[in-house]
Amino acid sequence: MSSPHIRPVIAQSYLSRVQILKEKLSPELLKGTRIGLEKESLRVSDKGGIALTNHPHTWGHPLTNTILTTDYSEALAEFITPAFSDVGDALDYLADLQSYAYQSLQKELLWATSMPCVLYGDHNIPIAEYGDSNIGKMKHVYREGLGLRYGRVMQVIAGVHFNWSLPEAFWPEFSKALGKYDSPEECRDTYYMRLVRNVLRGGWLIPYLFGASPAVCKSFFPNGVSHLPKFDDATYFEPYATSLRMGDIGYQNSKEEGLGIRADYNSVESYAQSLLRAITTPAEPWQRLGVSEEGEYRQLNANILQIENEYYSQVRPKPALKRLQSPAVALLDSGVNYIELRSLDVNAYHPLGVDEVQLRFLEAWLLMCMLSDSPSIDESENRELNENLLAVAHRGREPNIQLRRQGESVSLQEWGHQLLSQMYPICELLDKVNGGSNYEDALDEQIGKIIRPQLTPSARMLTEMEDNAESFYGFAQRLSKKHQRFLLERDISDERRAQFDQLIAKSHEDFAALSNQDSESFDQFLENYFAQTYAAVKTES
């Protein structure tokens, strides 16, 4: 079924590109879309606080395991799927992987929400360990630096990352049909960066539709004190919040903004160079902290960014990486390989942390962003985009909330309906290619949330907590236990189980081999690694 609302006028340039996909390209090219998931989960002890145990040996070694590793903390697990051509296959893999992990997890839960609980401060959050190899030390020291610069608490907020790309065979055909690019690679990079800019423009929509962090445990804040209103004695919240994770209590680079960094998304080259400049430019606040103390590294360097990953963004254009290659250098070398959408909260209501309806919608959303007109983003618009994201994160369900668009005020409902209505041609095409009505159904469900904010996950959470007289901790623990039961009861095929066993055994073998390969000191290793960034960076004109 389609929306009962009148659809606004849609740009002809966008429709003409959709028409190219319909008429000039093989449907198999859209069926070949590559989809991968990365889902973070905090391990929590049976007493309710962050787990202080090591990453389980039965999960493989976090340095070399490609499907199950750690993020910032030893307690923050990351489940990673390979790329699949269908979201259902990616979700099945994620379900099997989490079920497999649970079967060897002793007296601990995988936390069901993005926001953590019962933290007891920075000193109680163990930083992930990767062994004594140079690459392992680099990963650990980078995390030490994050904790030093921003505190450890915000680093254990969990999220879901959606990785998406079109098949390589798509780009020669699409480029030829457009008739305006010198190579398929130029077309690919141009259109992926168009996508990134439009995701940033409409980025507030993702926390509005899928945000699931309107409340937070008081232990998240120093001394349990916050400027946020109290929900109960153990919980802070905002009544119209959608995603405090994406708000100003979450992981943001506010300090970097003060240091003058802004990623430039107007081309692959400008994006890579803006990050390279930040990685090679000293920052006085970080210099004051010191790079090492008594011979031990505290951070990788004292520059604005230690490495590219430190720059927080809703979306990243990602390259195919060679071993020990800097991501920004790889982008300059080989262009964009896939898009990583990073703004999804963990879906507290689903045992996997994300569901099929969300992913079908996101597939269509990214394709719409790619095909829509996408002018460059100047500093004024960038400020608007940041303000819109924060406004929706903190008060997105507020009645009659207004956002800023091109210097003018626009209601969230009006803008949201315009954006979603533009997706119908894409959803109709994807449903035609794949059969059924999954994409249009997913879109209709999101339009329902624009019309009725009480249908959003953030509204459901607060209503449920109120109805149950439940703290955020009580809510999160109840759902964590419910999801644990679901995952432990799941049957995994013998073939899939054997595949996981093999990957985990291989990760331990690879780690052992890696430990014996280093032929240089850690100081020399870092110098050699960062030499590539200094060689590639251009001074700003």
Language-model features, listed with the residues they occupy:
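Histidine-centered divalent-metal-coordination microenvironment in nucleic-acid enzymes
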Residues: 40-42, 154-167, 338-345
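Generic recognition of stable, solvent-exposed alpha-helical segments in well-folded globular domains
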Residues: 36, 92, 96, 137, ...
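Extended, compositionally biased alpha-helical segments that mediate assembly or anchoring
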Residues: 433-541
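Loop-rich catalytic cores of soluble enzymes, especially ATP-dependent carboxylate-amine ligases
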Residues: 22-23, 131, 135-148, 152, ...
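Substrate-recognition/cap regions that form aromatic- and gly/pro-loop-enriched pockets
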Residues: 332-333, 339-427, 431
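Short conserved micro-motifs at the rims of enzyme active sites and ligand-binding pockets
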Residues: 52-55, 91, 124, 174-175, ...
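Terminal catalytic/cofactor-binding subdomain
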Residues: 2-147, 154-160, 187-197, 201
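A glycine-rich phosphate-binding loop feature that marks nucleotide/adenosyl-phosphate handling sites
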Residues: 116-118, 217-220, 382-392, 439-450
